[in-house]
């Protein structure tokens, strides 16, 4: 009897651990504020200016064993840009930069995910300021597992770089201020 119980528990544990490695859909946990889309750009070459987008939504599919099944989709409310300075934020929302009246959303949709050393290369199309261009993000799995509320979570950090001019933003900010670095941290809750 004990032998059957141990075998049953072992088989059950193996099935549960195998289930966590299969492709699963995750919703970005923005309700719990466990996700951030941030950026930084040099200010005149003297310092870094940091900003964030406060309103976005999306999800991802994650299969640790087969990254070719992975997908990422994120939609950002461009008017939610926040650099902790009201006048600058107003300027960033203007037609000189994000043109939020005309382009209310920015979107990222992956086209390919592949293993890249200890992390992943997430290749996709970024639509910003009405222009769509390919972008590659370097992503790393931070961790995954059960949460205290009966769910399962996975968290990632990703970094990338874009050129303002590639997205039709041609305001001259000086040569040191043409590239924007993206810093993304997301925690997803697996769909039940």
Swiss-Prot record:
Residues 1-23 form the signal peptide. InterPro entries: Lipid/polyisoprenoid-bd_YceI, TTHA0802/YceI-like_sf, UPF0312/YceI. Pfam families: YceI. One of its GO terms (cellular component) is periplasmic space. Keywords: Periplasm, Signal. It is found in: Periplasm. It comes from the Bacteria. Coiled coil: none annotated. Gene3D superfamilies: Lipid/polyisoprenoid-binding, YceI-like. The keyword Signal applies. Belongs to the UPF0312 family. Type 1 subfamily. PANTHER family: PROTEIN YCEI. This is UPF0312 protein Spro_1887. The lineage of its organism: Bacteria, Pseudomonadati, Pseudomonadota, Gammaproteobacteria, Enterobacterales.
């Amino acid at each position: 009897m004990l032998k059957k119980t141990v075998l049953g528990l072992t088989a059950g544990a193996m099935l549960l651990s195998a289930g966590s490695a299969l492709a699963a859909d995750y919703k970005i946990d923005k309700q719990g504020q466990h996700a951030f889309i941030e950026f930084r750009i040099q200010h005149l070459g003297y310092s870094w200016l940091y900003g964030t987008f406060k309103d976005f939504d999306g999800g991802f599919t994650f299969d640790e064993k087969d990254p070719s099944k992975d997908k990422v989709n994120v939609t950002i409310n461009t008017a939610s840009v926040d650099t902790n300075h009201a006048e600058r934020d107003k300027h960033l929302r203007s037609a000189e930069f994000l043109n939020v009246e005309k382009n209310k959303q920015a979107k990222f949709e992956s086209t390919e995910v592949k293993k890249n050393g200890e992390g992943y290369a997430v290749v996709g199309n970024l639509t910003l300021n009405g222009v769509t261009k390919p972008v590659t993000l370097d992503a790393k799995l931070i961790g995954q597992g059960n949460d205290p509320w009966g769910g399962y979570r996975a968290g990632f950090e990703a970094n990338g770089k874009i050129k303002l001019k590639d997205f039709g933003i041609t305001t001259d900010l000086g040569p040191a201020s043409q590239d924007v670095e993206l810093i993304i941290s997301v925690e997803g809750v697996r769909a039940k």
